[in-house]
Amino acid sequence: MSGRGKGGKGLGKGGAKRHRKVLRDNIQGITKPAIRRLARRGGVKRISNTIYEETRGVLKTFLENVIRDAVTYTEHARRKTVTAMDVVYALKRQGRTLYGFGG
């Protein structure tokens, strides 16, 4: 074995690489009505027009940080699939404990 633990991972030449579409500007998929619904849930009555782009920016930054931490946990465990627990631990690390998803 090559010191990789269980399974013979890392052996062979590897398969063909698939082309993956480059994702750009997907933050616009967070629509104005979706942001409005989130604000309503938070108790907001009126929403300024400038809020939508600002909210998208803040959400993008937040998700980048959480996903970066979750992927770090995944890589440390030598897995290729990010689990719900990886996200829970990533949120806990940032001081935002989330209950109800195991652990």
Swiss-Prot record:
GO CC, one annotated term: nucleus
Keyword annotations of the record:
Chromosome, DNA-binding, Nucleosome core, Nucleus
Name the DNA-binding stretches: 17-21
Subcellular location, principal: nucleus
Its domain of life?
Eukaryota
Where are the annotated segments for Disordered?
1-20
What's a single GO MF annotation on this record? Answer: DNA binding
Quote the InterPro entries the UniProt record gives: CENP-T/H4_C (IPR035425), Histone-fold (IPR009072), Histone_H4 (IPR001951), Histone_H4_CS (IPR019809), TAF_TATA-bd_Histone-like_dom (IPR004823)
Q: Where in the cell is it found?
A: Nucleus; Chromosome
Stretches of the chain forming a coiled coil according to its record: none
Q: Note whether DNA-binding occurs among the keywords.
A: yes
Keyword DNA-binding on this protein?
yes
Biased segments, Gly residues type: 1-14
Which SMART domains does the UniProt record give? H4 (SM00417), TAF (SM00803)
Share what the entry says about its subunit structure, partners included.
The nucleosome is a histone octamer containing two molecules each of H2A, H2B, H3 and H4 assembled in one H3-H4 heterotetramer and two H2A-H2B heterodimers. The octamer wraps approximately 147 bp of DNA.
User: What is this protein for, i.e. what is its function?
Assistant: Core component of nucleosome. Nucleosomes wrap and compact DNA into chromatin, limiting DNA accessibility to the cellular machineries which require DNA as a template. Histones thereby play a central role in transcription regulation, DNA repair, DNA replication and chromosomal stability. DNA accessibility is regulated via a complex set of post-translational modifications of histones, also called histone code, and nucleosome remodeling.
PANTHER family linked to this entry: HISTONE H4 (PTHR10484)
The family line of this record is: Belongs to the histone H4 family.
The misc remark on file is: The sequence of H41 is shown.
This chain belongs to which protein, by name? Answer: Histone H4
Q: Which organism is it from?
A: Physarum polycephalum
Q: Which gene encodes it?
A: H41
